[in-house]
Regions:
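Catalytic phosphate/metal-binding cores of nucleic-acid and nucleotide-processing enzymes, i.e., regions
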Residues: 1-88
Length: 88
């Protein structure tokens, strides 16, 4: 399944560079390991999407249920770079 997430410019750049390998988000969708995430860069200055996108695959989902500082109703998605087409 594919999901779309709006990413602020700074977070988008960290995801694109590989420095950010997780996403904390509300548990309001049916996320599953193996699902694809399409991050769409959002500019607060322009108040619109920039047109830049980045794809990742969910490798693991942590739902702490209020433990370890994670608020109830939130999850952490571990992200992997999506392999390029034709490459293994």
């Amino acid at each position: 399944m594919k999901h779309e997430i709006k990413a602020q410019e700074r977070n988008f750049n960290w995801i694109r560079s590989g420095r950010k390998t997780f996403e904390i988000t509300r548990a309001n969708k049916e996320y599953r390991p193996g699902d694809e995430i399409l991050f769409r860069e959002w500019s607060d200055i322009m108040n619109s999407y920039t047109g830049r996108t980045e794809e990742r695959i969910i490798s693991y989902i942590y739902s702490g249920g209020g433990q370890y500082g994670l608020a109830p109703g939130y999850i952490i998605l571990a992200l992997l770079k999506k392999p390029e087409a034709g490459k293994c």
